[in-house]
């Protein structure tokens, strides 16, 4: 099964190492794109802004407004706040993939994930990739998996004139979009 909306967001927060596991307290308002704020009846009214630490709390604490939603959550079938329903349906639609690749939250998260990899694995790209795969796969790795990813990052550097930082940022975004990260067996 695919992870639910809240599980996807929480997994990304955990992967980048910023999840706040504080229990209880008021709801939080994570950053949302300006286009989402502009769509509310009164631009941004009532949404507020939590500190970065509070915004990284688990998704169960995210403020829910019927007229305004966090894009990642709404695109991944968050609970319908307008009606009661004993079952939450799971869809797989192109907008989910587009949001996961192009959304502000995912791209910012990929950069933070890449920073975590640099801090934990040092400056060797192979070690950074190995650490990324350990985090997203949560299982022992095969050397061929690491080698393929190292080759892909080296291609980004050589063929697309990216520096190592930007190449790792893009690989981090790819890693957070892997099926094995988003689906459970």
Predicted regions and their residues:
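Amphipathic alpha-helical segments that form the core helices of the histone-fold
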Residues: 147-158
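An acidic, gly/pro-interrupted, aromatic-rich
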Residues: 1-136, 140, 175-185
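Short, charged, surface-exposed loops that flank catalytic or proteolytic processing sites
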Residues: 123-125, 158-167
């Amino acid at each position: 099964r695919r992870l639910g909306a809240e599980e996807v967001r929480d997994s990304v927060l955990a992967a980048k190492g910023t999840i706040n596991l504080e229990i209880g307290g008021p709801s939080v308002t994570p950053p949302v794109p300006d286009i989402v704020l502009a769509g509310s009846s009164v631009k941004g009214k009532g949404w507020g802004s939590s500190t970065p630490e509070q915004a990284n709390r688990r998704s169960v604490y995210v403020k829910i407004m019927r007229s305004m939603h966090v894009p990642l959550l709404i695109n991944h079938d968050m609970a319908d706040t307008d009606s009661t329903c004993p079952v939450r349906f799971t869809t797989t639609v192109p907008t989910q993939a587009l949001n996961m690749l192009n959304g502000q939250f995912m791209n910012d998260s990929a950069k933070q994930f890449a920073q975590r990899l640099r801090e934990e694995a040092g400056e060797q790209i192979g070690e950074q990739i190995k650490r990324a795969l350990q985090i997203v796969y949560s299982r022992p790795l095969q050397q061929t998996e690491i080698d393929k990813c190292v080759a892909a990052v080296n291609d980004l550097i050589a063929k697309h004139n990216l520096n190592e930082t930007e190449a790792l940022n893009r690989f981090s975004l790819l890693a957070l979009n892997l099926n094995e990260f988003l689906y459970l067996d």
